[in-house]
From Swiss-Prot:
HAMAP family: His_tRNA_synth. Homodimer. It holds the Pfam family HGTP_anticodon. It is found in: Cytoplasm. It comes from Salmonella newport (strain SL254). Belongs to the class-II aminoacyl-tRNA synthetase family. The gene is hisS. This is Histidine--tRNA ligase.
Length: 424
């Protein structure tokens, strides 16, 4: 017997019961994006490797350790996308969408990073991101955060996420702070773990989000990033905080909050949760005003965020399971008798025409009434339509409420109206 081929470690199958949950959550996210005027953009999964090296930074963990990179038959270096922003910017430049224009875009799809699989973090993961180009004020930063807050309300998880904010200033201000931070860390190398010692010279701001408690204690005495902000960044951040205060969105200023990718400047933010065990990030983003020019376009202000859907699905399942408890079908059509199958399929097609939003499944494969009602229960149907030879003969159908057990015979011509009343 041939050996079974299984999925690659960290790259998962999502089975029908799971995809129904994903579809409901994704539908909610997309509806909110549409209500703010954001448009979908669809991007390739594979890009040229230099795109990510230039955008993310050659000395980041993503580029150094986590990218799936390969050489194609032409000898070109290609990479499975580890994140979505770089590809979105590349597409905007390539198709002339950005210069002197305002764009609000969103994308969704799989991303790939070779890291240790764990709960909510996989080597193939799914991400939804939104990017805004051409607007530089704090008001659009605030809108993105308000949009995400609306998501949490729609999903029923607002009480389980909290917002952390920071400003990491201009590139020049960050360079000055970087020098001060490195000078401080050099004086305390005995406290640093090996990972922090490596980052101290390659990407020192990442030391700020070290999970090592000894390093975190040391950082209490480190120079504060806020003390190195330029005046424009300080004013921008104050404006953002004022808008969030007016909108009633609670937040914490976390001066150690930095993003793991090099292209960020000024605003950075994260929505975090403690409802999945240890604290985890649900959604994160910020401003990246220099990235478009860095990738070959003309200077264009930009801000955006990305969210890992695996972690979001886990959170909704954990704290609001009622949100995802939707049946596979609303109505199950039970048919028995030699002459009923054709009539049942004709009735089902007519009901799908008259009730396009309703999920209706017709029994196939035979079986007596008991077996067919068991199938209706398996698929979570609220209502069964029962069609036997006598109903076919007199043009009726029996409508049975599977929750209350009540049933009534209804003329087939008026059954759609009756079903709408039952389904609400």
């Amino acid at each position: 017997m041939a050996k079974n081929i299984q999925a690659i470690r960290g790259m998962n199958d999502y089975l029908p019961g799971e995809t129904a949950i994903w579809q409901r959550i994704e539908g909610t996210l997309k509806n909110v994006l549409g209500s703010y005027g954001y448009s979908e953009i669809r991007l390739p999964i594979v890009e040229q490797t230099p795109l990510f090296k230039r955008a993310i930074g050659e000395v980041t963990d993503v580029v150094e350790k986590e990218m799936y990179t390969f050489e194609d038959r032409n000898g070109d270096s290609l990479t499975l996308r580890p994140e979505g922003t770089a590809g979105c910017v590349r597409a905007g430049i390539e198709h002339g969408l950005l210069y002197n224009q305002e764009q609000r875009l969103w994308y969704i799809g799989p991303m790939f990073r070779h890291e240790r699989p764990q709960k909510g973090r996989y080597r193939q993961f799914h991400q939804l991101g939104a990017e805004v180009f051409g607007l530089q004020g704090p008001d659009i930063d605030a809108e993105l955060i308000m949009l995400t807050a609306r998501w949490w309300r729609a999903l029923g998880i607002s009480e389980h996420v909290s917002l952390e904010l920071n400003s990491i200033g201009s590139l020049e201000a960050r360079a000055n702070y970087r020098d001060a931070l490195v000078a401080f860390l050099e004086q305390h190398q005995e406290t640093l773990d090996e990972d922090c010692k490596r980052r101290m010279y390659t990407n020192p701001l990442r030391v700020l989000d070290s999970k090592n408690p000894d390093v975190q204690a040391l950082l209490n005495d480190a120079p504060a990033l806020g003390d190195y902000l330029d005046d424009d960044s300080r004013e921008h951040f104050a404006g953002l905080c004022k808008l969030l205060d007016a909108a009633g969105i609670a937040y914490t200023v976390n001066q150690r909050l930095v993003r793991g990718l090099d292209y960020y400047n000024r605003t950075v933010f994260e929505w975090v949760t403690n409802s999945l065990g240890s604290q985890g990030t649900v959604c994160a983003g910020g401003r990246y005003d220099g990235l478009v020019e860095q990738l070959g376009g003309r200077a264009t202000p930009a801000v955006g965020f990305a969210m890992g859907l695996e972690r979001l699905v886990l959170l909704v399942q954990a704290v609001n399971p009622e949100f995802i408890a939707s049946p596979v079908v609303d109505i199950y059509l039970v048919a028995a008798g030699a002459q009923t199958q054709s009539a049942a399929m004709t009735l089902a097609e007519r009901l799908r025409d008259e009730m396009p939003g309703v999920k209706l499944m017709t029994n196939h494969g035979g079986g007596n009434f008991k077996k067919q009602f068991a199938r209706a229960d398996k698929w979570g149907a609220r209502i069964a339509l029962v069609l036997g030879e006598s109903e076919v003969a007199d043009g009726t159908v029996v409508v049975k409420d599977l929750r209350s057990g009540e049933q009534t015979a209804v003329a087939q011509d008026s059954v759609a109206a009756h079903l709408r009343t039952l389904l609400g």
